[in-house]
């Protein structure tokens, strides 16, 4: 399995599949926001940023999957998936155990050199409350679904990183 994952990490297909899944999740979030009129909270915006990190890592990996650039993509992927797990866990705890003392910020805080909320306000401006439950599917809230998704991204990322020393076997079909 590790040899297979190493082989996949050196091809564009797996990276593009990951980019497609992250893009589909981002488009779904925008659909929830602009069509279903659900208000994203600050943690939702940060989770969206973590998902953009996974998308960016996938695109970097797809650019040159056989070069050391894929290691940069793996580091970004690991970091983004890990931060996504942290953020969605915090968001889930805020929704499951609401407290007047544990709340999220009113506005997303981006660095001065990257004011995403000013550059693309349709995507990065938060207007909702983190503890408010707005959407449920099969008994799980949106942060709980995202927690599972980010855990899956993180597990696969760890396995792909572990698989890097395992080179694919060369198949000699006609040799002895």
From Swiss-Prot:
Pfam families: DsbB (PF02600). The chain crosses the membrane at residues 15-31, 50-65, 72-89, 145-163. GO terms for cellular component: plasma membrane. Its main location: membrane. It comes from the Bacteria. Residues 32-49, 90-144 are periplasmic. InterPro entries: DiS_bond_form_DsbB/BdbC, Disulphide_bond_form_DsbB, DsbB, DsbB-like_sf. Disulfide bonds join 41-44, 104-130. Keywords: Cell inner membrane, Cell membrane, Chaperone, Disulfide bond, Electron transport, Membrane, Oxidoreductase, Redox-active center, Transmembrane, Transmembrane helix, Transport. The keyword Cell membrane applies. Required for disulfide bond formation in some periplasmic proteins. Acts by oxidizing the DsbA protein. PANTHER family: DISULFIDE BOND FORMATION PROTEIN B. NCBIfam families: PRK01749.1. Belongs to the DsbB family. This is Disulfide bond formation protein B. It comes from Escherichia coli O1:K1 / APEC.
């Amino acid at each position: 399995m590790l040899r297979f994952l190493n082989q996949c990490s050196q091809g564009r297909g797996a990276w593009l599949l990951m980019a497609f899944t992250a893009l589909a999740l981002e488009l779904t979030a925008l659909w929830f926001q602009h069509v279903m009129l659900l208000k994203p909270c600050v943690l939702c915006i940060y989770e969206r940023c973590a998902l953009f990190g996974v998308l960016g890592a996938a695109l970097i990996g797809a650019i040159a999957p056989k070069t050391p650039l894929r290691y940069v993509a793996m580091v970004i992927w690991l970091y983004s998936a890990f931060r996504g797990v942290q953020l969605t866990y915090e968001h889930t705890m805020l929704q499951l155990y609401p407290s007047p003392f544990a709340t999220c910020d009113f506005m997303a805080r981006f660095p001065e050199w990257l004011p995403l909320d000013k550059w693309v306000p349709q995507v990065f401006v938060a207007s909702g409350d983190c503890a408010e439950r707005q959407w449920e599917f099969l008994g799980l809230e949106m942060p709980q679904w995202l927690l599972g998704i980010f855990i899956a991204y993180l597990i696969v990322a760890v396995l792909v990183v572990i698989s890097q020393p395992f080179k694919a076997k060369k198949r000699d079909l006609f040799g002895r």
